[in-house]
């Protein structure tokens, strides 16, 4: 059986309300705006806004535009951007597994044309993994990787299980670079394997990486 990445494209478990709410919560906190202040600006009950940010309620029509005007954001509600971001993520990891570097660079070249729209959409968290790979294998920026790790570890409920498996695998590769952090790498690889199918590329990548972890 050929290796494959199992994509949960037909039954995605993370609701879009959670993705939108978490996106706005992060943008609000980045600007040091309290929940109470934003609720006051929106003339909205603080508890209702909190529920929105935690994905417990649907966004009323026009509310995204209102919040955008206050936070100076531009959230794109086109769901296709989310699906596209997932597609990029899986293609990048597959090309990584088969060592097709030029194919990876070609994907990132395409991404640059729509990056601003993707990052300001339901794809925000998925795209952070795409960025993590870029900083891991192309630009090699450790501080950016740690920054993304902190963000995503606090918002794992905004990622699908197949996305988490790739995310953990990439972090395992990152921490495996230093023998002193091999125990962290081991933990991430094992957690990644728990999230993916044993016939998947992600699982195979983890097993390959674990051999060197155990050898050191």
Description of each model-found segment:
Residues 10, 72-90:
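Short C-terminal boundary/hinge segments that cap the last helix of small helical domains
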Residues 108-116, 149-157, 190-198:
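Amphipathic alpha-helical segments of tetratricopeptide repeats
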Residues 79-80, 119-125, 159-167, 198-209:
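Alpha-solenoid helical repeat architecture
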Residues 87-99, 126-140, 165-180, 205-216:
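Tandem amphipathic alpha-helical repeat scaffolds
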Residues 2-31:
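A short, Lys/Arg-rich alpha-helix, primarily the initiator
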Residues 104, 144-145, 185:
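Single-residue signature of alpha-solenoid repeat helices
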Residues 31-51:
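Short alpha-helical DNA-recognition segment
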Residues 60-77:
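DNA major-groove recognition helix of helix-turn-helix/homeodomain DNA-binding modules
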């Amino acid at each position: 059986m050929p290796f494959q990445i199992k994509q949960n494209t037909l039954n995605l478990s993370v609701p879009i309300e959670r993705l939108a709410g978490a996106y706005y919560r992060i943008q609000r906190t980045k600007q040091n705006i309290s929940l109470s202040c934003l609720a006051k600006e929106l003339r909205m009950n603080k508890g209702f806004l909190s529920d929105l940010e935690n994905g417990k309620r649907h966004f009323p029509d026009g509310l995204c535009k209102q919040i955008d005007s206050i936070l100076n954001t531009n959230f794109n509600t086109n769901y296709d951007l989310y699906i596209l971001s997932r597609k990029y993520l899986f293609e990048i990891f597959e090309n990584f597994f088969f060592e097709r570097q030029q194919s990876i660079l070609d994907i990132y070249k395409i991404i640059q044309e729509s990056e601003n729209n993707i990052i300001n959409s339901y794809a925000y968290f998925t795209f952070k993994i795409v960025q993590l790979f870029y900083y891991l294998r192309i630009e090699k920026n450790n501080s950016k990787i740690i920054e993304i790790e902190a963000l995503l570890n606090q918002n794992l409920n905004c990622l699908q299980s197949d996305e988490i498996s790739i995310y953990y695998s990439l972090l395992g590769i990152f921490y495996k670079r230093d023998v002193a952090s091999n125990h962290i790498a081991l933990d991430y690889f094992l957690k990644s394997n728990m999230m993916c199918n044993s016939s998947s590329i992600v699982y195979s990548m983890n097993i390959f990486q674990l051999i060197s972890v155990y050898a050191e």
